[in-house]
């Protein structure tokens, strides 16, 4: 029984179920980019602004055939996928910021849940939020 518990803890601690580790798709020119800005919310958590260039958010196409530089965003906090994002603003509740240093990451995803890449590297933006 102890062996089983250790395996379960390892699986959950590596976050095996948080995203689709499937296919990667090279982007086409003009190459998309993503940058993040985060601001403390006056009530709870943080407001995230996602600055996108050359990328179309298309929630109506998710699950359909891939199109160049079109899809959705995946939002991760501390390695855990917390949402699909379909706009440039997103509110993240404080409960996700439980560490002293919290890693926020956004990736560009295809309609069929793959990750867009440039020269084999996932197109993403990462920032660290420090809890005081």
Predicted segments with their positions:
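N-terminal signal peptide c-region/cleavage motif recognized by signal peptidases
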Residues: 13-15
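Contiguous beta-strand segments within globular domains
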Residues: 40-54
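Short, well-structured beta-strand segments within conserved domains
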Residues: 46-50, 98-111
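Short amphipathic, basic-aromatic surface patches that mediate peripheral association
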Residues: 51-65
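Short strand-turn-strand beta-turns centered on an Asx-Gly dipeptide
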Residues: 75-80
């Amino acid at each position: 029984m102890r062996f089983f518990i250790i395996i379960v803890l390892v699986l959950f601690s590596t976050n095996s179920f948080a995203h689709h580790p499937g296919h990667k798709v090279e982007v086409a020119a003009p190459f998309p980019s993503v940058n993040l800005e985060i601001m403390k919310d006056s009530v709870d958590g943080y407001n995230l602004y996602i600055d996108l260039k050359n990328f179309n958010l298309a929630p109506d196409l998710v699950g359909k055939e891939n199109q160049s530089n079109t899809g959705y965003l995946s939002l991760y906090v501390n390695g855990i996928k917390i949402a699909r994002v379909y706009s440039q603003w997103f509110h993240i509740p404080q409960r996700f910021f439980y560490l002293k240093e919290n890693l926020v990451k956004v990736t560009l995803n295809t309609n069929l849940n793959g990750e867009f890449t440039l020269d084999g590297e996932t197109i993403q933006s990462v920032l660290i939020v420090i809890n005081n």
